[in-house]
Amino acid sequence: MSEPDPEPRHLSPRQAFDLLQEEPRAVLVDVRSNMEFLFVGHPVGAVHIPWIDEPDWEVNPHFVRQVRELMLGGVICDNDAGCAPVVLICRSGKRSTEAGRVLLQSGMREIYNVIDGFEGERDEDYHRSTLGGWRFEGLPWEQC
């Protein structure tokens, strides 16, 4: 029987923010589309590497390479400090979980997912940012 695919570690938005403040090597990667990143807003300091994007809405075939380049080839690991954390965020935590699985399968280690993402799930009126997420928690964000 095969082992289940590795899962990224899940953090609340506040836990992710705290990790990013405490660990200077940590990087926050926003995996949402260009439109979401630009027009909905994004966490301050996030690096944008889309997991799925327009025009075809297919998985970015260069995603792992782009994250590795961001992390200096994936070699930001040492015996004393371990590996630099990569924190992934999307709208509600689903795409970032998928992206995190792929990074783990590629051999990267310290991969985290922000549960509830930037906007969280929709409420009964189909509104976002009312139940959870980075914005709901009042964490720093900006809009282009």
Outline where the language-model segments fall.
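Rhodanese-like catalytic fold shared by cysteine-dependent sulfurtransferases
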Residues: M1-V27, N34-P85, S96-C144
